[in-house]
Structure formats: structure tokens, C-alpha cells
Amino acid sequence: MLPLMAAISSSSLGIGTSSYSPRYTILSSLIVYTLMRKTRAPFLLSSSFFQSFSLYYKSSLLNSMLMLPLLLHIPYYVKHNKL
């Protein structure tokens, strides 16, 4: 019941419904489900919390995608003493 609630609430409140892939929707549902299970707090169902969480998560996801090529090259630079 709780995974279904997490999936419904995350999709109905705008998490994962923009131009992102279904993988993003599944990931956001898993995060919401984990938060609901760990805290068991009713405030997780409030739309203001989901909107702020959605904006933060989308921006952090975008930033991490932009930083990924740099992070993948760090071991190379460390190995060859170019850092």
C-alpha cells in the first residue's frame, strides 16, 4: 500500500512528470517511498513539501548529470598526477 501511495503522490504532485525518463519517475517514487517508510510522517503528503522537494531534486539531478563527466575523469588525473 505504501509503495503505491508513494508512486501516486510523487506523480500527481509533479515529481517525474516533466520531460524526464520513466527511470526518473521510478527513482523519485523510490525516494518518496523510503522517506515515507523511514519517517512515517504525514507532512510528506503535503503538496508544498513535494513541490520544494521536486524542485530541489530536479536541480540536484541536473547538476549531478553535468558534473558526471568531470567526476569520471578525476581518477585519471590523480593517477597521472595532473591534478
Swiss-Prot record:
Say which domain of life the source belongs to.
Viruses
Q: What is this protein called?
A: Uncharacterized 9.4 kDa protein
Organism of this sequence: Thermoproteus tenax virus 1 (strain KRA1) (TTV1)
Record lineage? Viruses, Adnaviria, Zilligvirae, Taleaviricota, Tokiviricetes
